[in-house]
Amino acid sequence: KSVLFFDSQSSTKWMKANKFGFDFPKSTDFIKYIISMIPSKECIILDFFSGSATTAHATMELNAEDGGSRKFIMVQLPELIKENSEAKSEGYHTICDIGEERIRRAGEKVKSDLIEKNNKVGTLLENQVDPDDLDIGFKVFKLGSSNLTEWQAEFDELESNIDLFESNFLNDRSELDILFEIMLKNGLDLTYPVTEISEGSHKIYDVASGNLFVCLNDN
């Protein structure tokens, strides 16, 4: 039998240096090795128990090494952090908060390390990855209730409900909240690019280069 040995010492050291408070994080090198076994360099890596987002960290490192364009989806319940923990004292409230910040810092480090590596070589060789091509961006979505006002058809509440529908959307929701729900209802990926267009006093969202236009102005 083949035996693979990986330890998490470097991952633990990095997590402690960043005061994330994870005593036993998964080995970034081990996750990176598993991902490298997938033939496609353009796959989507899904981690349904993402914890501190080691999988996202490993994905970005591997892309920096072999020029892949892998993407990741991290899913994690917003578990509360212990009150007396170092991470709590640093301002993190949930495991998701730690994961988000780790992705930011890991992405910046992966890119800066790649720039430093290329500067030592002096010129960009054929198999080297251009730092400008390395995508370290990500979006954060939280599962919640619909942004649309719910219709209540009880007769004695009919008049008040009609007044509510002066706006189709809940008052405490942002335009981006509404936009992304509209994208989902139209079957559009949340990774599609969104740009803002000004037309007079109106703001229009262009989704996926003309695939969908959304204007949320009252008039």
Language-model regions: role of each:
Residues A53-H57:
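Glycine-rich SAM-binding Motif I of class I
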Residues K185-Y205:
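Conserved helicase/translocase motor-coupling segment
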Residues W151-F165, E175:
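Polar, glycine-rich mid-to-C-terminal structural blocks
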Residues Y33-C43, M60-W151:
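Cysteine-dependent PTP/DSP-like catalytic domain, specifically the C-terminal lobe
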Residues Y205-N219:
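Long, continuous compositionally biased terminal/linker segments
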Residues F49-G51:
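Class I SAM-dependent methyltransferase "Motif I" SAM/SAH-binding loop
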Residues K1-I44, D66, L77-K82:
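Class I S-adenosyl-L-methionine
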Residues F169-G187, T191:
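Glycine- and aromatic-enriched alpha-helical transmembrane segments of multi-pass membrane proteins
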